[in-house]
Amino acid sequence: MSKKLLYAAQMTAFDKDGNINLDGIRALVRYNIDVNKVDGLYVCGSTGEAFMLNTDEKKQVMETVYDEANGAIDLVAQVGSLNLKEAKELAKFATDLGYPKLSAVTPFYYNFTFEQIKDYYNEILKDVDNKLLIYSIPALTGVALTTDQFAELFENPKIIGIKYTNADFYLLERVRNAFPDKLILSGFDEMLLPALALNVDGCIGSTYNLNAPRVREEMDAFEAGDIDKARQLQNISNDMITDLIANDIYPTLKLVMKHMGVDAGYVKKPMSHPTPEMEAGATAIYEKYFKN
């Protein structure tokens, strides 16, 4: 089996009114552990719709995932927030629960300077004894860190790596070369194979809730030197991702999970609730890519 790490980005189940469905979250965790055999879960990130949750809701999600996982897999709590006080509170909460790793998205919207970004990470970590992955996703944050800036952030020994959700493969090569001992996890599911070629340590992704066995097979093929097989598997995954995006990816992920026997509930508004057309599209995706 591949030594590369496979993390699913944990989804958050909601009811129609946007209230958290704790049973749905537990079912998702169990599926990822028992069926998908993932190495870990990335909790309260973009896939978890965490930027639409209040502090107490984020704590509920973190607590429920931690309790259901019960030490079976690695867990990463995404605590980043524009509200630094909240980020610090969540970092302490997750650490006290027992999360072995934290992560934090770069602060966004206000065009913060790099010195302000560095201070943000150092403040989050100042009062907790834990490790952190920088969540770099410039397409959504507008924050594109450079190799030199990553080096400055890594001066804090608690910052151990990057969730690298960025299509800049030149930068990825430079960062991997400069920091061979840091944990770098690829965050774009559709770009996993080229990221593997640049020696990332593994991956974190939303579609791995559905597609983890195929992704594990791809990583195993890559590690075994069977690049043709790995490329064929990436082609299939990318066909699936194209279909998911065309059908509205976040609600469709949950609709396909329902076909797999897991009621992941609804997305949180202003995301769209399913239409009959969307449900039909999700059924077609399930039958094309997952039905045995």
From Swiss-Prot:
Reported temperature dependence: Optimum temperature is 60 degrees Celsius for synthetic activity and up to 70 degrees Celsius for the cleavage reaction. Is very thermostable, maintaining 80% of cleavage activity after 48 hours at 60 degrees Celsius. However, at higher temperatures (70 degrees Celsius), activity decreases to less than 10% in 8 hours. Temperature stability is further improved by the presence of stabilizing additives.
Usage in biotechnology: The good synthetic activity of this enzyme at basic pHs, together with its thermostability and pH stability at such pHs, underlines the potential biotechnological application of this new NAL for the chemo-enzymatic synthesis of sialic acid and its derivatives. Thus, these characteristics make this enzyme a promising biocatalyst.
Keyword Lyase attached: yes
Keyword annotations from UniProtKB, A to Z: Carbohydrate metabolism, Cytoplasm, Lyase, Schiff base
Enzyme Commission number(s) from the entry: 4.1.3.3
Leading EC class: lyase
GO term, biological process aspect, one: N-acetylneuraminate catabolic process
Molecular function, one GO term: N-acetylneuraminate lyase activity
GO CC terms, sorted: cytosol
pH dependence: Optimum pH is 7-7.3 in both synthetic and cleavage directions. Is active over a broad pH range, from pH 5.0 to 9.0, in both directions. Maintains 5 to 10% activity in the synthetic direction above pH 11.0. The enzyme is also stable at basic pHs, where it maintains around 80% residual synthetic activity after 15 days of incubation.
Active-site feature positions: Y135 (proton donor), K163 (schiff-base intermediate with substrate)
Subcellular location: Cytoplasm
PROSITE patterns: DHDPS_1, DHDPS_2
Pathway(s) served: Amino-sugar metabolism; N-acetylneuraminate degradation; D-fructose 6-phosphate from N-acetylneuraminate: step 1/5
Binding site for aceneuramate: S46, T47, T165, G187, D189, E190, S206
CDD domains recorded: NAL (cd00954)
Catalytic activity entry: aceneuramate = aldehydo-N-acetyl-D-mannosamine + pyruvate
PANTHER family: N-ACETYLNEURAMINATE LYASE
Function statement: Catalyzes the reversible aldol cleavage of N-acetylneuraminic acid (sialic acid; Neu5Ac) to form pyruvate and N-acetylmannosamine (ManNAc) via a Schiff base intermediate.
Quaternary structure and partners: Homotetramer.
Family label: Belongs to the DapA family. NanA subfamily.
NCBIfam families assigned to the protein according to its UniProt record, in alphabetical order: PRK04147.1
Stated name of the protein: N-acetylneuraminate lyase
Name of encoding gene: nanA
